[in-house]
UniProtKB/Swiss-Prot annotation:
Catalytic class of the enzyme: transferase
InterPro entries: KsgA/Erm, rRNA_Ade_diMease-like_C, rRNA_Ade_Mease_Trfase_CS, rRNA_Ade_methylase_Trfase_N, rRNA_adenine_dimethylase, SAM-dependent_MTases_sf
Keyword annotations of the record: Cytoplasm, Methyltransferase, RNA-binding, rRNA processing, S-adenosyl-L-methionine, Transferase
Residues reported in the UniProt entry to bind S-adenosyl-L-methionine: H37, L39, G64, E85, D110, N131
Keyword rRNA-binding: no
Subcellular location(s) per record: Cytoplasm
Organism from which the protein derives: Dehalococcoides mccartyi (strain CBDB1)
Reactions accelerated catalytically: adenosine(1518)/adenosine(1519) in 16S rRNA + 4 S-adenosyl-L-methionine = N(6)-dimethyladenosine(1518)/N(6)-dimethyladenosine(1519) in 16S rRNA + 4 S-adenosyl-L-homocysteine + 4 H(+)
EC number of this enzyme: 2.1.1.182
Keyword Cell membrane (UniProt): no
Name this polypeptide is given: Ribosomal RNA small subunit methyltransferase A
């Protein structure tokens, strides 16, 4: 992981000038209610693009293109870019800005009410690249990870603390970590300071990449069982697994103890200490012994 963005100060003025010109030309303002912080650092854009590893044949879905700084770079590299924007005030500006790009398509919609199948119109491989508004980060990740038509990879800008939770290791993992790791392999690309955006957010951000393979370590595990057990395990975090699962699942302690012993897990441990392999064992034990 790269810890800083050395090109931030040098590259910001050019993109900042472009952002101000576009905002003045279309009488635009960053809408706090939509969590808008427009990216103005070429150095940060370069890191996103390097992580995305785009090819001329790739299809990209971008959530919340904003003023189009990232969109423009994506269009230079990918075969098709489909941007989904909720803010009606940005639609005309984006349509005009990218009218010369035949590989650009803009959808005016709420991403949380639009499935990948509806966006793409067909079953094709795609990648998700986005500077996500903080307030919909978890919902967007969940939507695409749980979708029938999942992306090959996701490169997203999120709040730094959320990024730390996503990439946490065994011992520090929470429900968000498990939710992401059930479907893919997350990694932290770079921490991004507030000055990379206009207006700057009050907290730092981070670029996270999630690769979604054809098969994962959780292959063969019921999605329903996994999340049922995980939510129960983390429902009362300070409790031991024995107590948390018994309370969360509404099952007697002797039965839970039998499940944990069958999976080779000490009942005195806590949910955050389990590895993905141990969660898999527990899920398979649970599936094989319906309570």
């Amino acid at each position: 992981m790269e810890k800083d963005v050395p090109l931030l100060v040098a590259s910001a003025p050019s993109l900042m000038a472009q952002a101000k010109e576009m905002m003045e030309g279309y009488t635009l303002k960053a809408r706090k209610g939509l969590g808008q912080h427009f990216l103005i650092s070429q150095g940060v854009l370069n890191k996103i693009l390097a992580a995305a590893d785009l090819k001329p044949t790739d299809t990209v879905i971008e959530v919340g293109p904003g003023l189009g700084a990232l969109t423009e770079e994506l269009l230079k590299r990918a075969g098709q870019v489909i941007a989904v924007e909720l803010d009606d005030k940005l639609i005309d500006a984006l349509t005009e800005k990218f009218k010369g790009y035949p590989n650009f398509r803009l959808i005016h919609s709420d991403i949380l009410k639009t499935s990948p199948e509806e966006i793409l119109g067909q079953d094709v491989p795609y990648k998700l690249v986005a500077n996500l508004p903080y307030y919909i980060t978890s919902a967007v990740l969940r939507q695409f990870l749980e979708a029938k038509l999942k992306p090959e990879s996701m490169v997203v800008m999120v709040q730094k603390e959320v990024a730390k939770n996503i990439v946490a290791k065994t011992g520090d993992m929470g429900l968000l970590t498990l939710s992401v790791r059930f479907y893919g392999n997350p990694s932290l690309v770079s921490v991004v300071p507030g000055g990379a955006f206009y207006p700057p957010p009050e907290v730092d951000s981070a670029i996270v990449k999630i690769v979604i393979p054809q098969t994962t370590i959780m292959e063969g595990v019921s999605e329903v069982d996994f999340f049922k057990l995980a939510r129960a395990g983390f429902g009362t975090r300070r409790k031991t697994l024995l107590n948390a699962l018994a309370q969360g699942l509404g099952i007697s302690k002797p039965v839970i103890l039998s499940l944990l012993n069958g999976a080779g897990i000490d009942p005195a441990r806590r949910a955050e200490t389990l590895s993905m392999e141990e969660w898999k064992k527990l899920c398979l034990e649970y599936a094989g012994n319906p309570c």
